[in-house]
């Protein structure tokens, strides 16, 4: 619909140039066509007249009147009026929305997919949890947001690569190995001799038991076997990392999250990528030595202070491998790189960007892009749930999936803006009521399936072509409200991709489900008249299709029965 209205407005501008209202050399402005906040202001509004007023040497409202008069007639536009200082409001005819139903039916699974990305490459990194324990609910929020964002970008025509970065080379891995070794030697977290910064969850005992039993972990085709020797710290380290990476992969698979690339921090050192990044920074002239340490002049690139890259003992600070890792993304040809992180990592953003800019390789400012999420509070029975017995210090993603469902967890973790703190109410997520948004949306999809089964049971033969031809009979407010929502879906997908905000899909699906449930309660679908019945079934099937398309972008199932 936006494309149609933009074309009409463009023809109107040409008419004003032809009759002298606008100078002949006036270029069409970059006007917007958008949905007003309230329906009273029409279905769409444009600011075109306000942008053209200066060229016409006219006040915006007067030019708006001239532009409205110059618009060509269209069967899809019922009325055009002017509001405020010169906004032009379009009220669409029912035929415009009825035609949209046909678009949904014809395009099916592809309805809502666009070409904004034009096949360009984007890398989306998310979760990137340290392989030191089970995934917690914060990782779950990162997984839900990142995976849905990747799906939305794919729907907008981007060539998406999903990436998981494993920090498998730091102090935390050493603490993990020491913790598993202590368990393997018979110690507990309360024993004297337990590592000072050791991990205390019950899962450490599970890893130690598997190691001592000589179990083999199949990690993406790479077999790692426990040597049973509690004194062999290096073997324990390899086994523990493989064991926990494998466990995280199983949890992510249950959450319907997968990746194209698993990138190991250790490979950056092994392949010389950290040293390569450091040498590029030195060669660029944006480093200096002081106090035996190597510093990056990151203040030249917006940081609040210069940063140590290499300490006096020769080891690198943690942000150096981060810079090296993102350099590999640039070298791998990503036009865009998007990283989903917890908000507690905010401080690293400027440093990584400064390091990339300092290399003077033509990497754009603001590359990579970041999506930051806030904390999640888990509630049950009105009280906060703080601990998991197995993890020892946090609520795990597996806990939530087992208590509710993967569908509910994905929905609730993505349904609000990432930068807002989130309360996950287990009781609400389990409720089979309209108060539970994922149930409410899924039930709309299942309800259509139920109506189609009922039609078959009653012996009605549904003729979709007949239904499409008879959509004009659906001109009541509730039918048109559903059609309006269906027409919005491609815009919502496009905007969600532009803003990197997949939560907008969830908001939209609730609104579509509400319009559908309202229509269903106010309109008998399986009526005796075949024309009306087929038209209503066609509207229901179109709604079912858009619900399924949107739920797929969120990684949530579209059940046929509930």
From Swiss-Prot:
Gene Ontology CC: cytoplasm
Catalytic activities: tRNA(Arg) + L-arginine + ATP = L-arginyl-tRNA(Arg) + AMP + diphosphate
Residue positions of motif 'HIGH' region: 129-139
Top-level taxon in the UniProt lineage: Bacteria
Gene Ontology MF annotations: arginine-tRNA ligase activity; ATP binding
CDD domains per UniProt: ArgRS_core
Subcellular location: Cytoplasm
Enzyme Commission number(s) from the entry: 6.1.1.19
Pfam families linked to this entry: Arg_tRNA_synt_N, DALR_1, tRNA-synt_1d
Coiled coil (UniProt feature): none
Keywords: Aminoacyl-tRNA synthetase, ATP-binding, Cytoplasm, Ligase, Nucleotide-binding, Protein biosynthesis
Enzyme class: ligase
GO biological process: one example: arginyl-tRNA aminoacylation
HAMAP family listed in its UniProt record: Arg_tRNA_synth
Annotated family: Belongs to the class-I aminoacyl-tRNA synthetase family.
Assembly description: Monomer.
Protein known as: Arginine--tRNA ligase
Biological source species: Xanthomonas euvesicatoria pv. vesicatoria (strain 85-10)
Gene: argS
């Amino acid at each position: 619909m936006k494309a149609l209205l933009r074309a009409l407005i463009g023809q109107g501008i040409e008419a004003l140039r032809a009759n002298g209202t606008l100078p002949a050399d006036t270029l069409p402005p970059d006007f917007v066509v958008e949905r007003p906040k309230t329906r009273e202001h029409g279905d769409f509004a444009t600011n075109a007249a306000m942008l053209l007023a200066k060229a016409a040497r006219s006040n915006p409202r007067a030019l708006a009147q001239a532009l409205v008069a110059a618009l060509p007639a269209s069967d899809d536009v019922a009325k055009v009026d002017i509001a405020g200082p010169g906004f032009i409001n379009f009220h669409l005819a029912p035929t415009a929305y009825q035609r949209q139903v046909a678009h949904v039916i014809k395009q099916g699974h592809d309805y809502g997919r666009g070409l904004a990305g034009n096949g360009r490459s984007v890398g989306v990194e998310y979760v990137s949890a340290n392989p030191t324990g089970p995934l917690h609910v914060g990782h779950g929020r990162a997984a839900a947001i990142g995976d849905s964002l990747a799906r939305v970008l794919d729907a907008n025509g981007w060539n998406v690569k999903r990436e998981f970065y494993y920090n498998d080379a730091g102090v935390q891995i050493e603490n993990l190995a020491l913790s598993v070794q202590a368990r393997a030697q018979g110690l507990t977290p309360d024993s004297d001799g337990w590592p000072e910064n050791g991990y205390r969850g019950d899962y450490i005992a599970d890893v130690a038991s598997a190691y001592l039993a000589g179990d083999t972990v199949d990690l993406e085709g790479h077999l790692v076997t426990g040597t049973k020797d509690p004194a062999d710290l290096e073997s324990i380290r390899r086994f523990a990392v493989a064991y926990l990476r494998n466990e995280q992969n199983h949890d992510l698979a249950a959450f319907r999250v997968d990746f194209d690339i698993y990138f190991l921090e250790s490979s950056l050192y092994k392949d010389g990528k950290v040293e390569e990044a450091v040498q590029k920074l030195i060669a660029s002239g944006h480093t200096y030595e002081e106090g035996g340490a190597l510093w990056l002049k990151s203040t030249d690139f917006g940081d609040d202070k210069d940063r140590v890259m290499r300490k006096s003992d020769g080891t690198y600070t943690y942000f150096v491998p981060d810079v090296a890792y993102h350099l590999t993304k640039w070298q791998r040809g990503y036009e865009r790189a998007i990283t989903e992180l917890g908000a507690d990592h905010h401080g690293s953003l400027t440093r990584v960007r400064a390091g990339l800019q300092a290399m003077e390789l033509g990497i754009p400012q603001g590359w990579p892009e970041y999506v930051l999420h806030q904390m999640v509070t888990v509630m049950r029975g009105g009280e906060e749930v703080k601990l998991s017995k197995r993890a020892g210090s946090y609520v795990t993603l597996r806990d939530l999936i087992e208590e509710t469902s993967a569908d509910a967890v994905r929905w609730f973790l993505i349904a609000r803006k990432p930068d807002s703190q989130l309360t996950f109410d287990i009781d609400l997520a389990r409720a089979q009521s309209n108060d539970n948004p994922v149930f409410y949306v899924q039930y709309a999809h299942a309800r259509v399936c139920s109506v189609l089964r009922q039609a078959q049971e009653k012996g009605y033969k549904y003729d979709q072509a007949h239904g499409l031809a008879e959509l004009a009979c659906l001109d009541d407010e509730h039918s048109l409200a559903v059609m309006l929502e269906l027409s919005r879906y491609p815009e919502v997908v496009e905007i969600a991709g532009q803003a990197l905000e997949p939560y907008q899909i969830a908001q939209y699906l609730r609104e579509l489900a509400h319009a559908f449930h309202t229509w269903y309660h106010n309109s008998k679908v399986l009526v005796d008249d075949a024309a009306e019945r087929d038209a209503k079934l066609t509207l229901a099937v179109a709604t079912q299709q858009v619900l399924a398309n949107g739920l797929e972008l969120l990684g949530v199932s579209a059940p046929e029965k509930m």
